[in-house]
Amino acid sequence: MGQKINPLGFRLGATQGHHSLWFAHPKKYSEGLQEDQKIRDCIQNYVQKNMRIFSGVEGIARIEIQKRIDLIQVIIFMGFPKLVIDDGSRKIEELQINVQKEFNSGNRKLNIAITRIGNPYGHPNILAEFIAGQLKNRVSFRKAMKKAIELTEQAGTKGIQVQIAGRIDGKEIARVEWIREGRVPLQTIRAKIDYCCYPVRTIYGILGIKIWIFVDEQ
């Protein structure tokens, strides 16, 4: 059987960049990783509670963290930042206070910025959230996958593969269903492929959604 490598790690330094940009002493490296995870979890929880914007999709494509001696810079790439923009900087300040409460930043200043991304449905995380919302509302998985493919085609991608695994439609035996449209060259390193793995809780149990999007070839 073929061994599946993570498409993002496979392309690091070629077509993909790191989402955390900092250096640390080897002994303190694990602390830095845990700190990053706390920041990401805190932001996602806050967005889930306060910023339900568009059909149950939070719209976070990725969160980049850059650290210096005196500053932690967090950039949130969002597809639908309407609520944040409408409320001005008040929501961002509230989010900064929430994140600072969660972890000890010490003498470092925390700065959070929000960047809007074009073609949000060209990003696998946002697309996975859309499919998860559909599955929670008991929409047929085939219908949800086809709708997701339509949305990515409008975003101008070259290919997409969607896979859903688990107790699909409440069937007793778990299975894997997938659909592909266009080209998805997973073995070509110069092909820019975005990927995400997203768990969704349904009344029948947890389903796993995996999405590969072929953006462009460099």
Curated annotation (Swiss-Prot):
What keywords is this UniProt entry annotated with?
A: Chloroplast, Plastid, Ribonucleoprotein, Ribosomal protein, RNA-binding, rRNA-binding
Q: Name one molecular function that GO assigns to this entry.
A: rRNA binding
Q: Which Gene3D superfamilies match?
A: 3.30.300.20, Ribosomal protein S3, C-terminal domain
Q: Where in the cell is it found?
A: Plastid, Chloroplast
Q: Which GO terms describe its biological process?
A: translation
Domain of life according to the entry: Eukaryota
Span of domain KH type-2:
47-118
Q: Which Pfam families match?
A: Ribosomal_S3_C
Principal place of residence: plastid
Q: Which GO terms describe its cellular component?
A: chloroplast; ribonucleoprotein complex; ribosome
Concerning its family, UniProt says:
Belongs to the universal ribosomal protein uS3 family.
Subunit info here reads: Part of the 30S ribosomal subunit.
This protein is called Small ribosomal subunit protein uS3c
Native source species: Cucumis sativus
The opening ranks of the lineage are: Eukaryota, Viridiplantae, Streptophyta, Embryophyta, Tracheophyta
Chain's gene name: rps3
